[in-house]
Amino acid sequence: MPKRDAPWRLMAGTSKVSRSANYSPRGSLPKRDAWVNRPMYRKPRIYRSLRGPDVPKGCEGPCKVQSYEQRHDISLVGKVMCISDVTRGNGITHRVGKRFCVKSVYILGKIWMDENIKLKNHTNSVMFWLVRDRRPYGTPMDFGQVFNMFDNEPSTATVKNDLRDRFQVIHRFHAKVTGGQYASNEQALVRRFWKVNNNVVYNHQEAGKYENHTENALLLYMACTHASNPVYATLKIRIYFYDSITN
């Protein structure tokens, strides 16, 4: 017959709990990862002094910004705009020399239909592609020149095989609007923020134009999926960039 367990008062100092057991509330996380979700003021000093690099490698501050505000008429054949056009100068919106790094891109605005189109029963999806052009030359290539589509459908667009080494899709997204008398959704908000760390190189010209790029131009391609009903996009696109140290 098994003996009864001794009273707890007599077992003081003779704990049966294994010393190797881990009852830490953080589970089996490494100590390095346990501080990730903690506020900066509650982290150890070494984590406060070794913060992540705000400034991209090889660049120097301050962080500069350039905005592109425009209303776009988007159709099935697509549209393109260059969002790395930065003029050379000394301001907070200018580049100092030939080289700079676009750290992030912020796109916000809305997609909408006019009064005549929104009364028709249809659904229209607007698709966006953020593309890096590694070897820009002349003028930006049209949507149909860069992308290969099945049955002229932008939702099936992929970069053509012979252009894959030059054009790289960094991000893509879409938004949808619906017209009609009952289930109408005539506008859709757009808000995207991406880290890209794209190193842009210009030639000796000062003007911020696509034709003055020599490496890594950023292009935004837009197209809608409905053949007969175009839509409008009122967008504000901001790029945040740093000048290169080697300028």
Swiss-Prot record:
It is found in: Virion; Host nucleus. Keywords: Capsid protein, DNA-binding, Host nucleus, Host-virus interaction, Metal-binding, T=1 icosahedral capsid protein, Viral penetration into host nucleus, Virion, Virus entry into host cell, Zinc, Zinc-finger. It holds the Pfam family Gemini_coat. GO terms for molecular function: DNA binding; structural molecule activity; zinc ion binding. Its main location: virion. GO terms for biological process: symbiont entry into host cell; viral penetration into host nucleus. The keyword Chloroplast does not apply. A motif (Nuclear export signal) lies at residues 92-113. The keyword Iron does not apply. A motif (Nuclear localization signal) lies at residues 31-45. InterPro entries: Gem_coat_AR1 (IPR000650), GV_A/BR1_coat (IPR000263), Viral_coat (IPR029053). GO terms for cellular component: host cell; host cell nucleus; T=1 icosahedral viral capsid. A motif (Bipartite nuclear localization signal) lies at residues 3-20, 191-238. Homomultimer. Binds to single-stranded and double-stranded viral DNA. Interacts (via nuclear localization signals) with host importin alpha-1a. Encapsidates the viral DNA into characteristic twinned ('geminate') particles. Binds the genomic viral ssDNA and shuttles it into and out of the cell nucleus. The CP of bipartite geminiviruses is not required for cell-to-cell or systemic movement. Belongs to the geminiviridae capsid protein family. This is Capsid protein. It comes from Tomato golden mosaic virus (strain Yellow vein).
